[in-house]
């Protein structure tokens, strides 16, 4: 039996009164073991299918041949689990589903014949088999315990002395257990039924007094079943101990539909914690089965429920789960979530072993070996007389026992039985860490308690059980709860004549569980010195009294008289004066105690008289919901308005917290060391996750989406730049943990946060396929960033599931993770489609980015061409010089003549051999190294351009021809040089930038010398190629003669490949000038030197 999977069954219930009143439609269908569900908002889509071990159709009546009754559910699940218990295995059955889905009905049932649940039927069948199989060599003992887990606190329901929360501990051999939990001995099914009823009463009283809800607490009913057998041949006694755990989990309830607030929100948070932790444990165990590595951490201790169920979930147990479903379309989301939960559970495998003594195990193995050898010898033709005197006994397994003369040696006590399918490590005192005296004393006391319980005899356990029963009855009698005449408290019996009160509770299991008699005369209700004792909020010491007075005709009239200041309501109306009660009236005392008044004799007399029933309760049942609705209607409170008010309060709270988060993010952005976009997005993501997760604990995903859409997400005020596809991902800093020690669980949590943030930024427009694609990509990116192995292939599914549970998904895009082949194929197609869509989006984004880059490059080329047309060139360019990539300016005549070679942007400059550092290189170095020099040169260049623009305008007005510039095509793969490294404002300030394309330059046929302006010297015809002078042209070091002699060889222009060019004719030998001569402005000739008075004397 080792390594068996968890058995999973689903059961759909009929419509309840609320669903019938809303004309709900059934969206669940079953065919064999396959369960399908249809999205009511997307009815054209294919249904989502799930396959389980059992699918029970209980939506219709008994007349339907497909109807699954309580007996059928027990035959399929209960009998199999009981058989495993007799074999010596631990057994667990737990029910899961939303509130009102039928969990308690499946587990507990009702008192009517044929309506009993799994727990009563299993207990009754247990004692039936015990009575049949009991003999002198085989004896049985049964002990039970009943506890409740509410708000992470454990409460003992069978011990009236247990007031506070019990402590959960874990023993290295016994496993998790509840300290001081009472285990009571029982001898019949009646005893078990008595204890179950007492536990339910205690649960009801505590829940009503403390304003708790039973559906918000987990109930665990445990049966310890021991089988003792005596072997007459060996004289050894052996035991097999089975623990049967029957769990009724709390239902999931939506805060918006219940109007939960205050304490209810805290309860919901704790229930969400337990159920969420249970889901995480189930997911981790399911992932554990799909890979070889077995060292993953299972978060059992995150909640009390999972800690106590540690052995039942993936441990030493045979486990079955029953998922209760609602068929209504208004509960589609909860039903689909339950189906996915159950589908995940069926992947868990438990390693169950038989819990027996080592001696019994050894004897059983030897008997099986002897039987095998005997069959082998018999198959070879040997007779029974030749088998060595082996004796056959009917009751032994295999029918063979070893000879009595040689009994097997007992097993060594140093080898304990297996635990969870593996051998327990030996605990030596030297290996244990050093502990303090207080912890040592605590361990000693706990060990002594365990030893005392193990050594306690059966008679002592029975006496203890009887003492606790007497204490419970005394406590109930003190509270005014009615008991039977024989002292038993099994069920709720209705007196035939006596008027009485029956409690009503939100949980159907706890409703009509307590009965209070109204005796003749006066019956007082309150907290102190009363006949019916009630506690809780708004219950006064003397709250009210019931006066029972017989009438002359034999009828007993009961009058309710409230005390001053006590809140007492009858049929929803506040009572301040004495009021005669009628049978069926609803009475509310305080805020939590709800009763229904029953008067059997009065009802019988009215039926005999033919009195028509009063227009009180309608056809719907008179239960707790009806009483609460009636109370609110009578007080003028609209439930829908209250729900809207509650939602508005939550929205205002979210808005306030968002404003605080915005202020905090803004401060962090202003004062933090790093102000990069990654850090800003990271802080916004953390704050958004904090607000969304806190809001999700109180509201469903759809309501969370609406609130976030209206209010927005926290932001630091910094514009969020879109992330490029080719952007290198930066390492994220995990909150509160060193990234080197990040685990896979931390990466999953980080992925959930970031995906929820992205989905919220996109206004929750992501569907299921998109969320799955994001989860897969995010997990792969995080694993690669932190150097972690990607682990199992379906790790992203857990991330996607957490995202669905937190922010939901777009309507119509949800899909089921069903177990059928069609569902799996559909999920695969959706995955491929999502992957293709993602790749298409990536390619489109890359294309857009490349197009933008091309547009930027084209704009730069056009801008450089426009600048080229504006800036005049003073050098005559020839075709050969253009091919060489150099521009040579002809020196002017005179002592200040200079010749320098200036490189263009096509090729690097040719450095002369002498002097060692040219003026161009010196200027370039200063521009790169000296910021002050760079600013001054840029400022000077702008001034010169403005002056040159003014001179050109004056020359144009004088009728002169403007020299067309040479065409210069900037390189595509070369870094821009000065002056294009200046700021954009400087480039836009140059003249001609805003104009359109200038016409291509055409060389004129004749050269026209522009007339000289007044008071200026006309240009000399002997110097048509004079260059512009400035203060950085080398000064006197570069002055040469005024003759136009040929250039030295080392100063001649070179080609890119190093080959020299052919000698070019001088300007004087050319047939005509290529461009018109250029006149140098007088004020631009010298900057730092004194003016040349000799040359300028004529002009002056």
From Swiss-Prot:
A GO term from the CC aspect: microtubule
Residue positions where Phosphothreonine is found in the record: 1080
Listed name of the protein: Kinesin-like protein KIF1C
Annotated Pfam families: FHA, Kinesin, Kinesin_assoc
Superkingdom of origin: Eukaryota
InterPro entries assigned: FHA_dom, Kinesin_assoc, Kinesin_motor_CS, Kinesin_motor_dom, Kinesin_motor_dom_sf, P-loop_NTPase, SMAD_FHA_dom_sf
CDD domains: FHA_KIF1C (cd22728), KISc_KIF1A_KIF1B (cd01365)
Keyword annotations of the record: ATP-binding, Coiled coil, Cytoplasm, Cytoskeleton, Methylation, Microtubule, Motor protein, Nucleotide-binding, Phosphoprotein
Biased composition (Gly residues): 952-961
Assigned protein family: Belongs to the TRAFAC class myosin-kinesin ATPase superfamily. Kinesin family. Unc-104 subfamily.
Extent of Pro residues compositional bias: 404-419, 1000-1018, 1062-1080
Record text on subunit structure and interactions: Monomer.
Region annotated Disordered, chain positions: 393-435, 894-917, 951-1100
Positions of the FHA domain: 523-590
Ranges in a coiled coil: 359-381, 438-479, 634-671, 827-871
Biased composition (Basic and acidic residues): 1089-1100
Residues modified as Phosphoserine: 295, 494, 674, 676, 914, 1031, 1089
Main location: cytoplasm
Residues that, per the record, bind ATP: 97-104
Chain's role: Motor required for the retrograde transport of Golgi vesicles to the endoplasmic reticulum. Has a microtubule plus end-directed motility.
Statement: the UniProt record of this protein carries the keyword Protein transport: no
Gene giving rise to this polypeptide: Kif1c
This protein's record includes keyword Amino-acid biosynthesis: no
């Amino acid at each position: 039996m080792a390594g068996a999977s968890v058995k999973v069954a689903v059961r759909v219930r009929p419509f309840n009164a609320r669903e019938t009143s809303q004309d709900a439609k059934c969206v669940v269908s079953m065919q064999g073991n396959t369960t399908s569900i249809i999205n009511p908002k997307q009815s054209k889509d294919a249904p989502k299918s799930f396959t389980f071990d059992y699918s029970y159709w209980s939506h219709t009546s008994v007349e339907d041949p497909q109807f699954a009754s309580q007996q059928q559910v027990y035959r399929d699940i209960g009998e199999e689990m009981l058989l495993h218990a007799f074999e010596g295995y631990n057994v667990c059955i737990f029910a899961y589903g939303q509130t009102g889905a039928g969990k308690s009905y499946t587990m507990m049932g009702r008192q009517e014949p044929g309506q009993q649940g799994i727990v009563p039927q299993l207990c009754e069948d247990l004692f039936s088999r015990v009575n049949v199989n009991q003999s002198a060599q085989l004896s049985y003992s049964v002990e039970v315990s009943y506890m409740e887990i509410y708000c992470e606190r454990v409460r003992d329901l069978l011990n009236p002395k247990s007031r506070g929360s019990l402590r959960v501990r874990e023993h290295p051999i016994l496993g998790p257990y509840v300290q001081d939990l009472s285990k009571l001995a029982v001898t019949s099914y009646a005893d078990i039924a008595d204890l179950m009823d007492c536990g339910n009463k205690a649960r009801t009283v505590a829940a009503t007094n403390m304003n708790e809800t039973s559906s918000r607490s987990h109930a665990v009913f445990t049966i310890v079943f021991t089988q003792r057998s005596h072997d007459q041949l060996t004289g050894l006694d052996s035991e097999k101990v089975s623990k049967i755990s029957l769990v009724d989990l709390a239902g999931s309830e939506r805060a918006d539909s219940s109007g939960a607030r205050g304490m209810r929100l805290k309860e919901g948070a704790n229930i969400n914690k337990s159920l969420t932790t249970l889901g995480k444990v189930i997911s981790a165990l399911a992932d554990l089965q799909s890979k070889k590595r077995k060292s993953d951490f299972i978060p059992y201790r995150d909640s009390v429920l999972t800690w106590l169920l540690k052995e039942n979930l993936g441990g030493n147990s045979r486990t079955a789960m029953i998922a209760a479903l609602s068929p209504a379309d208004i509960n589609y989301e909860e039903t689909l979530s339950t189906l996915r939960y159950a589908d995940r559970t069926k992947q868990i495998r438990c390693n169950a072993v038989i819990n027996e003594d080592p001696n019994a195990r050894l004897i059983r193995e030897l008997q099986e070996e002897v039987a095998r050898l005997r069959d082998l010898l018999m198959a070879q033709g040997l007779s029974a007389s030749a088998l060595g005197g082996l004796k056959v006994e009917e009751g032994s397994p295999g029918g063979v026992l070893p000879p009595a003369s040689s009994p097997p040696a007992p097993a060594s006590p140093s080898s304990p039985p297996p635990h969870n399918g593996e051998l327990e490590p030996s605990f030596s005192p030297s290996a244990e860490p050093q502990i303090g005296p207080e912890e040592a004393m605590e361990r000693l006391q706990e060990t002594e308690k365990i030893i005392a319980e193990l050594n306690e005899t059966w008679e002592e356990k029975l006496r203890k059980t009887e003492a606790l029963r007497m204490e419970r009855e005394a406590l109930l009698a003190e509270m005014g709860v009615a008991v039977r005449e024989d002292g038993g408290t099994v069920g709720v019996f209705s007196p035939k004549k006596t008027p009485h009160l029956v409690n009503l509770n939100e949980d159907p299991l706890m409703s009509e569980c307590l009965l209070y008699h109204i005796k003749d005369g006066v019956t007082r209700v309150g907290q102190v010195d009363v006949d019916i004792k009630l506690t809780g909020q708004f219950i006064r010491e003397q709250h009210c009294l019931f006066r029972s007075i017989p009438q002359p005709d034999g009828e007993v009239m009961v009058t309710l008289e409230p005390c001053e200041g006590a809140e007492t309501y009858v049929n929803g109306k506040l009572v301040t004066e004495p009021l005669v009660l009628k049978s069926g009236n609803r009475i509310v005392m305080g805020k939590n105690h709800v009763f229904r008044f029953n008067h059997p004799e009065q009802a019988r007399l009215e039926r005999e008289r033919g009195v028509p029933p009063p227009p009180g309760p309608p056809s719907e049942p008179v239960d707790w919901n009806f009483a609460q609705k009636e109370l609110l209607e009578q007080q003028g409170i609209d439930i829908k308005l209250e729900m809207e008010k509650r939602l508005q309060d939550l929205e205002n709270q979210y808005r306030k917290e968002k404003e605080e988060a915005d202020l905090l993010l803004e401060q962090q952005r202003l004062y933090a060391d790093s102000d990069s976009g990654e850090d800003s997005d990271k802080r916004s993501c953390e704050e958004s996750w904090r607000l969304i997760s806190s809001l999700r604990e109180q509201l469903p995903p759809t309501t969370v989406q609406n609130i976030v859409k209206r209010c927005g997400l926290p932001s630091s005020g910094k514009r969020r730049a879109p992330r490029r596809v080719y952007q290198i991902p930066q390492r994220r800093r995990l909150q509160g943990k060193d990234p080197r020690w990040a685990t896979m669980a931390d990466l999953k949590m980080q992925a959930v946060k970031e995906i929820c943030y992205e989905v919220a930024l996109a206004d929750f427009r992501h569907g299921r396929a998109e969320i799955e694609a994001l989860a897969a990509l995010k997990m792969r990116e995080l694993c690669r960033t932190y150097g972690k192995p990607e682990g199992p292939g379906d790790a992203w599914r857990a991330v996607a599931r957490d995202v669905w549970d937190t922010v939901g998904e777009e309507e119509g895009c949800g899909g089921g993770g069903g177990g059928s082949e069609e569902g799996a194929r559909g999920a695969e197609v959706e995955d491929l489609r999502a992957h293709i869509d993602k790749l298409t989006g990536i390619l489109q984004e890359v294309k857009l980015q490349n197009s933008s880059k091309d547009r930027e490059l084209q704009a730069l080329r056009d801008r450089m061409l426009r600048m080229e047309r504006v800036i005049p060139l003073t050098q005559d360019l020839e075709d050969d010089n253009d091919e060489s990539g150099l521009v040579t300016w002809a020196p002017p005549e005179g002592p200040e003549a200079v010749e320098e070679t200036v490189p263009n942007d096509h090729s690097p400059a040719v450095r002369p051999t002498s002097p060692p550092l040219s003026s161009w290189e010196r200027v370039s170095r200063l521009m790169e190294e000296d910021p002050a020099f760079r600013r001054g040169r840029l400022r000077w260049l702008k001034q010169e351009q403005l002056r040159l623009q003014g001179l050109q305008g004056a020359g144009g007005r004088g009728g002169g021809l403007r020299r067309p510039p040479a065409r210069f095509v900037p390189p595509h793969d070369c870094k821009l040089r000065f002056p294009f490294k200046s700021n954009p404002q400087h480039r836009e300030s140059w003249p001609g930038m805003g104009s359109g394309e200038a016409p291509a330059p055409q060389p004129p046929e004749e050269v026209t010398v522009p007339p000289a302006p007044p008071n200026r010297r006309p240009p000399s015809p002997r110097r048509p190629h004079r260059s512009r002078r400035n203060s950085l042209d080398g000064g006197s070091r570069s002055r040469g003669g005024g003759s136009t002699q040929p250039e030295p060889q080392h100063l001649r222009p070179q080609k890119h490949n190093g080959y020299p060019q052919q000698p070019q004719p001088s300007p004087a030998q050319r047939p005509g000038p290529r461009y018109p001569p250029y006149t140098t402005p007088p004020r631009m000739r010298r900057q730092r030197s004194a003016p040349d008075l000799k040359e300028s004397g004529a002009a002056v």
